[in-house]
Amino acid sequence: EIYTLSLHDALPILVDVIDVGIAEQHALTASAGMAFAGLHPVVALYATFLNRAFDQVLMDVGLHRAGVTIVLDRAGLTGTDGASHNGMWDMALLAHVPGLRLAAPRDEAGLRDALRQALTVDDAPTVVRYPKGALPEPMPALRVEGEEPFGAVDILLDSGRQAGEQELFEQRAPLLLVGVGAMAPAALEAGRALAAEGAAVQVVSPRWAVPVPDALVELALGARGVLVVEDGLVDGGIGSQLRDAMDDRVEGGGPACAPPVVRVGVPRRFLATASREEILQECAMDAPGVLAAARRLAERCQ
């Protein structure tokens, strides 16, 4: 009750709040029915509990292109909530739902924008995910690539252009670091360290991660190496989806070959209960781990 009332307070445009209890499957099926009746339901779940309702997302909401928005609290690593509560599966799972769009905001302003944008979509499901606790500090973009809102990719760092070395930048393709959602700060920290060492590097953050934006594919194909950092399952996650999209572009008559893609994320195993910081360090997903992976990629792509 407290959870649903707080949601109602945050979204005064809501007509009503329905607490279905611990019945995620029913919540999704009921929301599809509400959408068919002309409403736009918002379903609030812990990310890990969406797993048990995947069939309803796929067959009741996705198949019928119902305008339902799902907001996933505690997405990514939750640490001391316990091994069962890590919301690490959603991006890999939901990418298989045709027509579904998923946003992974990196800060509070992005979260608010993503929710507003999701509510404008009435012919497909939308998902907005955010981590446990406070979102990272505001991270303004230098510029935006792609079409807003769903194809927009924010450029957070562009070392060659920022330094005024346009000619050098054009002669040397950059490393591209992609920070998905709450992992954008780690990607940006690694990018700044590489830039300080003289590397040409871009750090970007897609506002909507599923499907992979065309602008992100273009940026990746123009890089000499790509590193994707995400707080979800690495197998089938955003890095895997980007790599597949790049390969499809090559096979469709694009560039002769695609640059290498390194994926940093949660490995395919159950994680022991620990603090979020300890798990990030264990999985080499903290800032030092991301920087080490970026340096290995830079050496490989010299």
Segments (PLM) and residue ranges:
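Hydrophobic beta-strand scaffold residues
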Residues: V17, P41, V68, R101-L102, ...
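Glycine-rich anion/phosphate-binding loops
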Residues: F49-D55
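Short, small-residue-biased leader/transition segments that mark boundaries at the very start
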Residues: I2-L11
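Thiamine diphosphate
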Residues: Q25, L50, L63-N86, M91, ...
